[in-house]
């Protein structure tokens, strides 16, 4: 197919195809070689190779341009969409992952990626359960449940996960954290104070009800309520 027309004509056709040209690039090595005429690797081409799990083309691009940034981008994007197969092919045997890659997975609820790096030795509880705090802030409930199932502490870093979820109005996340040990009373009911400050009334009502269950209405009204009213 490639030999039917001169390269110059194919270049015109590829320009005409716009974003669809990336699929044509990956038909075979001849078409891919046209993309290599560019001095800088096109990130959209990297994305297409990952989405189609075209490992051969991805390795060719990385080898040709010989830029570590391309591999970094490929790994980051793969973590974001959960393409564990690409990740396995791109990393050495002793590679256990980085917080940046886990962050990409958490942002997109890709627990299969997190599980993969955990199986290679990545510490999911690194830096006082930083990943759980991040999941709470990003409202990645699926990931939060996964991390807690692996031993993450909902009271980590002075109850930070609940505080971050409350500040950002993530009601289901707040409920999950409280049900799994987060302290409603920590730091003088800081989570309630912040939820109220940002207008998350459903969270305020829920946390107040939970606090009353723990300390009783009298103590709640006399001691806790004045702290944030």
From Swiss-Prot:
Keyword hit for RNA-binding: no
ANK repeat start and end residues: 70-95, 96-126, 127-156, 157-186
Alphabetical list of SUPFAM superfamilies matching this protein: Ankyrin repeat
Keyword line: ANK repeat, Repeat
Gene3D superfamilies: Ankyrin repeat-containing domain
Domain of life from the UniProt record: Viruses
Record protein name field: Putative ankyrin repeat protein L148
Species for this entry: Acanthamoeba polyphaga mimivirus (APMV)
């Amino acid at each position: 197919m490639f030999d039917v027309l001169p390269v110059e004509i194919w270049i015109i056709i590829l320009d005409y195809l716009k974003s669809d040209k990336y699929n044509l690039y990956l038909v075979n090595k001849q078409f891919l070689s046209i993309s290599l005429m560019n001095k800088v690797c096109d990130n959209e081409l990297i994305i297409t190779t990952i989405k189609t799990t075209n490992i051969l083309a991805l390795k060719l691009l990385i080898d040709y341009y010989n830029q570590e940034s391309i591999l970094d981008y490929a790994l980051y994007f793969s973590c974001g969409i959960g393409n564990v197969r690409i990740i396995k092919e791109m990393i050495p045997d002793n590679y256990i992952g980085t917080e940046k890659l886990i962050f990409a997975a958490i942002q997109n609820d890709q627990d299969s990626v997190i599980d993969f790096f955990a199986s290679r030795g990545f510490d999911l509880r690194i830096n006082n359960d930083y990943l759980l705090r991040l999941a709470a802030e990003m409202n990645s409930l699926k990931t939060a449940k996964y991390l807690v199932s692996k031993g993450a502490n909902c009271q980590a870093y002075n109850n930070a996960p609940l505080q971050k979820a409350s500040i950002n109005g993530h009601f289901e996340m707040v409920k999950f954290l409280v049900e799994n040990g987060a302290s409603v009373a920590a730091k003088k009911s800081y989570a309630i104070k912040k939820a109220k400050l940002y207008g998350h009334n459903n969270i305020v009502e829920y946390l107040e009800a939970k606090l009353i269950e723990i300390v009783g209405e009298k103590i709640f009204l006399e001691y806790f309520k004045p702290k944030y009213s």
